[in-house]
Regions:
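Short, small-residue-biased leader/transition segments that mark boundaries at the very start
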Residues: 2-4
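Conserved NAD(P)H cofactor-binding loop of Rossmann-fold oxidoreductase domains
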Residues: 20-25
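Substrate-binding pocket helix/loop in short-chain dehydrogenase/reductase
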Residues: 28-29, 36-38
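A short, exposed helix-loop element centered on a Lys and neighboring polar residues
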Residues: 52-53
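Residue(s) in the substrate-gating loop at a strand-loop-helix junction
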Residues: 72
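The catalytic Tyr-X3-Lys active-site helix of short-chain dehydrogenase/reductase
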Residues: 78, 83-95, 99
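SDR active-site lid
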Residues: 109-181
Length: 181
């Protein structure tokens, strides 16, 4: 809501709000780095939560409003694959799904002119893992962790590329090539 309070808008209401926030990382629970776990939750869950909170006054001021929150297929199934641990990401996306389902009832009872839904997209060919590494200052493609390489390998495999037997450095080079293009 601090964001909302600091902004000046040309209108006092909005009719639709899209909350789409995501960052890879956080990784495993067993050997987590707390700051990475927190950052994953801060973006993936709290990005959606604070988006709703910041713009709720403008939605309430409208004749009718709609909120669309983006979770992930990993908010249904907590797995990218058997060799990739991403507990923080899945937990955050489950939280978005649960928050949205609870918000639907909350709005129905307290603001029936505002509706809400959650979108659960499947794996989409983005560079979320790589972009996250760069945002966190972990370097480029050649510095990708084995977890990030496994994630990108699964993405390439899903796209139909025969990458199962490629060495990890070849996967890193493929990602680097995509970055440079």
């Amino acid at each position: 809501s601090d964001v909302y309070k600091r902004q000046e808008f040309d209108t006092d209401h909005i009719n639709i709000l899209f909350n789409n926030a995501g960052i890879a990382g956080g990784g495993a629970f067993v050997n987590m780095v707390r700051t990475e776990w927190d950052r994953c939750f801060d973006v993936c869950f709290y990005g959606v939560f604070y988006g709703c909170n910041a713009f709720m006054p403008m939605l309430l001021a409208s004749d009718e409003g709609y909120i669309v929150n983006t979770s992930s297929v990993n908010g249904f199934w907590a797995s990218v694959g058997p060799d990739v641990s991403h507990t923080a990401y899945s937990a955050a996306k489950f939280a978005v799904k649960g928050f949205t389902e609870a918000l639907i009832t909350d709005l129905r009872l307290n603001a029936p002119h505002v509706k809400c839904s959650v979108v659960m997209p499947g794996h989409i060919g983005t560079s979320i893992a790589l972009n996250t590494s760069q945002v966190l200052g972990k370097g480029g493609a050649m510095d990708m962790s084995s977890e990030e390489v496994a994630f990108m390998r699964s993405r390439y495999s899903e796209a139909g590329l025969p990458v199962d037997n490629l060495p990890d450095d070849d996967i890193r080079k493929m990602v680097l090539q995509v970055q440079e293009d």
